[in-house]
Every structure is written in structure tokens, then in C-alpha cells.
């Protein structure tokens, strides 16, 4: 809740500055989500729907995404002004693109910890991370949790998956 409040205060403050300097013309902002419109997107969609951004002098357009990596690429290319993406994907972009001068940066954390998870049916017998050894897992290649799985596996002594 505090994160939401800080986000709104920041947006309203920026909006006040933008509207004062632009003679009350709405400042256009293209915002790229990491994924489709779903629960976590409400943080960005609700202020648009309620007119909060517009009241602050911001004309915000929020577009659905196709993964954190894509959101970061679009912000880095200048196609979007801002975006929402997984921190692991942002770190990966920085590591793989040292030549890019204006790399996207994280300005706010939404989650206290990654919302990634491994799900299995009870009948699978998987009850702890080590039980994943030798199993097959499925996740999209662009998924932030999948990209971070190697670190999780190493920290939890999980064998080949």
C-alpha cells in the first residue's frame, strides 16, 4: 500500500511540474507493461481509468506487453517513455548491452521479493526445491522467473532440471 501511495505522489508531483511548464498541456507518456493486463497492472491502469494522470497533466497510455525483456527493449529504444519489468531482466539487459548509452534504470520497486514460483501437483512428490532434480519444467523463454532459476537452483542445491 505504501508503494502505491509513493507511486501516486511521485506521479502527481511530476504532473504538477509538467503541467506548469507546459502551459497546462497534457504531457504524453507511453508506458509499456511487462505482460498482459492482469492484477499487478492495476497499479498503472487504475489511475488512467480514474483520470488521476489526466488531472495531473499527464496523458498516459498503458500498453500490454509480451515479457519483461521486451518491455526493457522498447524503453531502451525510445519507443516507450517508461515501463514495468522484472529486475532480473533489467540486469540481464545491462550485462548484455554495455554499449547502450541510455540504458533503462529502475526507479521504483513494486514487489518486496520476486513473485516467481514453481508449481507442481501434489501427486508429483515435489515438496522442496531439491525434489526438482531430474524433473522437467516449463516456462516461456522470456519469463523473469525462468531466467533467475539458475540462481535459485544453485542456492538450494538443486541438480539438473
Model regions and ranges:
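Absolute protein N-terminus
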Residues: 1, 25-26
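N-terminal export leaders
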Residues: 3-8
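Cleavable N-terminal signal peptides
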Residues: 13, 23-24
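Short, glycine-/small- and polar/acidic-enriched structural segments
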Residues: 27-160
